[in-house]
Design a protein with these regions (language model features):
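Membrane-helix boundary elements
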Residues: 6-45
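Membrane-water interface at the C-terminal end of transmembrane alpha helices
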Residues: 109-121
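Core segments of alpha-helical transmembrane spans in multipass integral membrane proteins
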Residues: 18-25, 43-66, 74-83
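Non-cytosolic membrane-interface motifs at loop->transmembrane helix junctions
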Residues: 38-45, 95-105
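Residues within membrane-spanning alpha-helices of integral membrane proteins
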Residues: 7, 14, 52, 72, ...
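Membrane-interface elements of multi-pass transporters and channels
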Residues: 30, 34, 38, 67, ...
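Membrane-helix boundary connector in multi-pass membrane proteins
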Residues: 64-66, 73, 84-102, 118-120
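Membrane-embedded alpha-helical segments of multi-pass transporters/permeases
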Residues: 25, 63, 87, 112-115
Length: 121
């Protein structure tokens, strides 16, 4: 993978996490409804907002042309594990939201590309 492709891969990951994080902070119930197809329980808004803040932090850590190696590893791990969890939830019927499959497959694609980038160089 060329340096420019690598920068764009991690920048795309950062943009997606920043957007998702901001959405979770501003309208957590809507995001969770789209992903899981069910309303949040008591305190769920607060947990979703806290998770949104963590995604904002991850996005900021990977923003720009100089995404540090440790930040790249963190983003790679997050995308890989998020793919497994979201797709597993969808397959088992735990999550039935409109966006669970697209989100799971997006994380799978990004995580796979990041793993390939990490171990092919």
């Amino acid at each position: 993978m060329t340096k420019l492709s690598r920068i764009n891969l991690y920048k795309l990951g950062a943009i997606l996490e920043l957007a998702t994080g901001a959405a979770l902070v501003v309208c957590p119930a809507l995001v969770m409804q789209l992903l899981f197809g069910s309303p949040l329980g008591s305190g769920g808004d607060h947990v979703a907002q806290l998770y949104g803040l963590a995604l904002l932090g991850l996005g900021v850590a990977c923003w720009g042309d100089s995404c540090a190696d440790q930040s790249q590893k963190g983003l790679m791990m997050y995308n890989s594990v998020a793919a497994i969890v979201l797709i597993s939830f969808a397959v088992r019927g735990i999550a039935a939201g409109l966006m669970v499959w697209p989100a799971g497959l997006m994380h799978l694609a990004l995580g796979s590309l990041m793993v390939w980038d990490r171990f092919s160089s």
